[in-house]
């Protein structure tokens, strides 16, 4: 190491629920980046993905997250990730050995045909086969039901996912943006029939969206469920970087075709007074922690022990290096500072009451 050069930040790992798998607390995601943004498609996208994925592995990241619907056209992100990973494995077989890499994808939105989306047994099987081909792998470690499917019986979904896991095409399966009730129903349906239960959930979680992860899912982190979480949008699609405080910069995610719904989210946060809170958080991060708001927002997510991993949207190496520095912020965040942050946010959910909480009928007697 050169004089005055800082040592590499240590990567941390957590158990992903009851899967037995250890995942890096920061992971690499492909949503709204590769296969979509200018300069990140086709061959150019593969080159840039390789550069970022290579650095990610060197820094200890072991989970790479994708979905059949990511990219334009759908599946383009999987193709870029698959080709980049294939080339990297040939260039450095040791660091990219398959036994150390965790690959995840999600099934729900496939093609435009009536049977090319949803969670029918047909689409789960055909969608996964297509994803495996694009990713250039024999199996994925984590397979998610990208959303709940109200038109397919839960038992059908559980049986199809069980078949996928037991056929060796996925190591384990989980859900994304399912309610606690839906996850619980699927879990017990699997357990009672000797099938494979869901073992992880991918919810949105950040300083501005807390209720589901901190309250609704609370019972699911305990026995017997032991659900792990791979959280997405830790920066609220960039809102928590502060770059949208004074408008929408050209070339940002909110200007991309197909992501117009994010503008509605921004407007909603403005109405709720979130931008003023973000300014205060940025000042607090700078004056009390000596870091950027981005680092604080990521560190805050990791500080929650029920978060297994935080998915990053990385498009260049410098961005990755910056994000990795959030780990040192996490190490130094005190309980008093977390209370200060809660006071600024003023959105802490009510603690989970459980079966003995205020929601129960009380009997007053002597």
Language-model features, listed with the residues they occupy:
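N-terminal binding-site loop/beta-alpha segment at the start of enzyme catalytic domains
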Residues: 1-101, 138, 166
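Beta/alpha (TIM)-barrel catalytic core signal, keyed to glycine-rich beta->alpha loops juxtaposed to Asp/Glu
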Residues: 3-6, 45, 148-343, 363-366
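Active-site mouth loops of central-metabolism enzymes
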Residues: 32-47, 110-125, 146, 150-152
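Acidic-and-aromatic substrate-binding clefts and catalytic sites of carbohydrate-active enzymes
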Residues: 40, 69-80, 111, 149-153, ...
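Short, acidic/polar
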Residues: 42-56, 117-135, 183-188
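Short beta-strand segments at enzyme active-site cores
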Residues: 63-68, 104-105, 139-144, 174-175, ...
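A short, structured active-site edge motif that brings together acidic residues
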Residues: 95-111, 201-205
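Active-site groove signature of glycoside hydrolases
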Residues: 132-153
């Amino acid at each position: 190491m050169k004089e005055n050069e800082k040592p590499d930040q240590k990567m941390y790992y957590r158990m992903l629920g009851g899967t037995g798998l250890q995942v890096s607390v920061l992971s690499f995601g492909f949503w709204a980046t590769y296969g979509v943004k200018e300069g990140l498609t086709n061959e150019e996208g593969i080159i840039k993905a390789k550069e970022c994925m290579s650095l990610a592995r060197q820094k200890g990241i072991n989970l790479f997250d994708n979905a059949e619907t990511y990219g334009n056209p759908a599946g383009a992100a999987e193709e870029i990730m698959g080709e980049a990973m294939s080339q990297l494995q040939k260039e450095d077989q040791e660091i990219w050995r398959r036994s150390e890499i965790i690959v995840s994808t999600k099934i729900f939105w496939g093609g435009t045909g009536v049977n090319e989306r949803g969670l029918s047994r047909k689409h789960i099987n055909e969608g996964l086969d297509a994803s495996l081909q694009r990713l250039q792998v024999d199996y994925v470690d984590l397979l998610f039901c990208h959303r709940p499917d109200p038109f397919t019986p839960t038992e059908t979904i559980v049986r199809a996912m069980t078949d996928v896991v037991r056929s060796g095409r996925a190591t384990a399966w989980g859900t994304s943006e399912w309610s606690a009730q839906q996850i619980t129903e699927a879990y017990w349906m699997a357990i009672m029939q000797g099938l494979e239960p869901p073992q992880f959930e991918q919810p949105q979680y950040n300083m501005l969206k807390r209720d589901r992860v901190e309250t609704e899912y609370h019972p699911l982190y305990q026995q017997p469920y032991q659900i792990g979480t791979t959280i997405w949008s830790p920066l609220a699609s960039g809102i928590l970087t502060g770059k949208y405080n004074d408008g929408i910069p050209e070339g940002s995610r909110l200007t991309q075709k197909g992501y117009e719904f994010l503008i509605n989210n921004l407007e909603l946060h403005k109405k709720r007074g979130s931008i003023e809170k973000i300014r205060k958080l940025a000042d607090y991060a700078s004056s009390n922690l000596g870091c950027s708001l981005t680092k604080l927002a990521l560190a805050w997510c990791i500080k929650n022990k029920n978060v297994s991993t935080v998915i990053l949207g990385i498009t260049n190496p410098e961005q990755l290096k910056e994000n990795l520095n959030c780990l040192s912020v996490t190490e130094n965040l005190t309980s008093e500072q977390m209370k200060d942050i809660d006071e600024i946010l003023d959105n802490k959910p009510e603690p989970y009451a459980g079966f003995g909480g205020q929601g129960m009928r009380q009997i007053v007697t002597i």
